């Protein structure tokens, strides 16, 4: 057998990581706290985790919250695993799953999540790609029922057109907008902001970061 490419090696290491990677996550729908985290802490998820800098730092700074990193691509999630395995302390409040966001209802029950982060997800700028945008009406209506009452969706992007599109979708659907800005670092949310790797790179080059927050104000 020839040597596996590094990407495949990373994926295999991720899949074999019983400490952080959750295989067959649909088995735990409605049972994440009971069977996986074994506590009653709030659960926050990041959809489109990428290299995982954001959720890694969130988990490191908030031990009383359970975090789940979600991405479609295992190879990318392996980079988060590297961070977790090289951390000087073992984090028990973070797990990794690899699924397509459109199947998220198979993984979580209604009102199971406290917060959903959408950080610098692909804007899919072409009109005929709108169906792939994670802030279109299909996805937002998919995400909101997973939230507890008053749970939040937090969305950040450096793409102004994508931000304006997402803002329009929220308003057209009469979602409860609690915060919106075209300059995050000049806002009240700047103090508690945790950057992604992408965000740090482009904000250092002078790009403004846009953010909006949607609240689930409908009781389940």
Curated annotation (Swiss-Prot):
Residues at which S-adenosyl-L-methionine binds: 46, 71, 100, 122
PROSITE patterns in the cross-refs: SAM_MT_TRMB
Pathway noted in the entry: tRNA modification; N(7)-methylguanine-tRNA biosynthesis
UniProtKB keywords: Methyltransferase, S-adenosyl-L-methionine, Transferase, tRNA processing
Active-site positions on this chain: 122
GO molecular function: tRNA (guanine(46)-N7)-methyltransferase activity
SUPFAM superfamilies named in the record: S-adenosyl-L-methionine-dependent methyltransferases
Annotated EC: 2.1.1.33
Tagged with keyword NAD: no
Binding site for substrate: 126, 158, 196-199
Superkingdom of source: Bacteria
Cellular component GO terms held in the UniProt record: tRNA methyltransferase complex
Reactions catalysed according to its record: guanosine(46) in tRNA + S-adenosyl-L-methionine = N(7)-methylguanosine(46) in tRNA + S-adenosyl-L-homocysteine
HAMAP family, per the entry: tRNA_methyltr_TrmB (MF_01057)
Family: Belongs to the class I-like SAM-binding methyltransferase superfamily. TrmB family.
Task of the protein: Catalyzes the formation of N(7)-methylguanine at position 46 (m7G46) in tRNA.
Protein name: tRNA (guanine-N(7)-)-methyltransferase
Organism: Malacoplasma penetrans (strain HF-2) (Mycoplasma penetrans)
Gene assigned in the entry: trmB
């Amino acid at each position: 057998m020839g040597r596996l490419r590094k990407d495949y090696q990373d994926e295999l290491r991720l899949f074999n990581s019983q400490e952080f990677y959750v295989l067959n996550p649909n088995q735990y729908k409605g049972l994440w706290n009971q069977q996986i985290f074994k506590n009653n802490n709030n659960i926050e998820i990041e959809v489109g985790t990428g290299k995982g800098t954001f959720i890694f730092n969130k988990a490191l700074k908030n031990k009383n919250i359970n975090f789940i990193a979600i991405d479609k691509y295992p190879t990318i999630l392996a980079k988060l695993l590297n961070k977790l395995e090289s951390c000087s302390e073992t984090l028990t409040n973070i797990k990794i799953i690899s699924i397509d966001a459109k199947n998220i209802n198979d993984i979580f029950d209604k009102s199971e999540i406290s917060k959903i982060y959408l950080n610098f997800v692909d804007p899919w700028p072409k009109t005929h790609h709108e169906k792939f945008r994670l802030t279109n009406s299909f996805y937002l209506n998919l995400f909101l029922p997973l939230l507890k009452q008053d749970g939040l969706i937090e969305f950040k992007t450096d793409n102004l057109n994508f931000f304006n599109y997402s803002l329009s979708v929220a308003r057209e659907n009469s979602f409860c907008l609690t915060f919106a800005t075209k300059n995050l670092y000049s806002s009240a949310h700047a103090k508690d902001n945790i950057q992604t790797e992408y965000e740090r790179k482009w904000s250092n080059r002078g790009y403004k970061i846009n953010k909006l927050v949607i609240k689930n104000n409908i009781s389940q």
